[in-house]
UniProtKB/Swiss-Prot annotation:
This is Large ribosomal subunit protein bL9. Belongs to the bacterial ribosomal protein bL9 family. Coiled coil: none annotated. Keywords: Ribonucleoprotein, Ribosomal protein, RNA-binding, rRNA-binding. The keyword Ribonucleoprotein applies. The gene is rplI.
Length: 166
C-alpha cells in the first residue's frame, strides 16, 4: 500500500515522501496514529503544495542540529561511581543516566538518540558516546567514569583539614 508520510521516520522516509508499506502496517499503525495518509490524487496534490514549507522545515531542523552539535561536541560528563575492592562498578552507566546529566546542563536529548557503542559503560575510564541529532548529523560527547571516594577517605581528609585549622 502506498502512503504519504506526515512525519520523518528513521527507516522509512522523510515527511512528504510517498512510500510503499505493508497493508497491515499502514492500516494498524501509520494511518490510525496520523503518521501517514493514503496516497491518492487529492493527497498528492496537497503535499505538492506543501513541499516548499516541508523543505524549509527540514532545513531549519538541520540548522538546529548543526548548532546543537557544535555545543555538544564540547561537553564532557563526569560520573563518580562506587566500586568494590577489585575495581568493579556496582552500577553501570546507560543512556538514561547520560540523558539526565545532559538535561541538567540544559540539553533536552531523547534517550533513544544516545548511542553507547558498548551498550552500557561498566568500567572506569573515558568513553566517546554518540548523540544522533538529525540525518547524518551526530555529536560525540566525552563521558568519564571516576572512582568515588569512600566515606572513610572523606572522614580522614576532614580530620586532617580540622587539624590544620587548629
Amino acid at each position: 500500500m502506498k502512503v504519504i508520510l506526515k512525519e520523518d521516520f528513521t527507516n522509512l522516509g522523510r515527511e512528504g515522501d510517498t512510500v510503499e508499506v505493508k497493508d497491515g502496517f499502514a492500516r494498524n499503525y501509520l494511518l490510525p496514529k496520523g503518521f501517514a495518509v493514503f496516497s491518492n490524487k487529492h493527497n498528492v496534490e496537497i503535499f505538492n503544495q506543501k513541499k516548499r514549507s516541508i523543505l524549509k522545515k527540514q532545513e531549519t531542523k538541520k540548522q538546529i542540529a548543526n548548532d546543537l552539535k557544535s555545543k555538544l561536541d564540547l561537553v564532557k560528563l563526569e560520573f563518580f561511581m562506587k566500586s568494590n575492592d577489585s575495581g568493579k562498578l556496582f552500577h553501570s552507566i546507560n543512556s538514561l543516566n547520560i540523558a539526565e546529566e545532559l538535561l541538567k546542563l540544559g540539553f533536552d536529548i531523547e534517550r533513544k538518540k544516545i548511542d553507547i557503542h558498548h551498550g552500557t559503560l561498566k568500567a572506569f575510564g573515558t568513553y566517546d558516546v554518540t548523540v544522533k541529532l538529525y540525518e547524518g548529523i551526530s555529536a560525540i560527547i566525552k563521558v568519564e567514569i571516576k572512582k568515588e571516594k569512600k566515606q572513610e577517605d572523606k572522614k580522614s581528609l576532614n580530620k586532617k583539614l580540622n587539624k590544620v585549622d587548629e
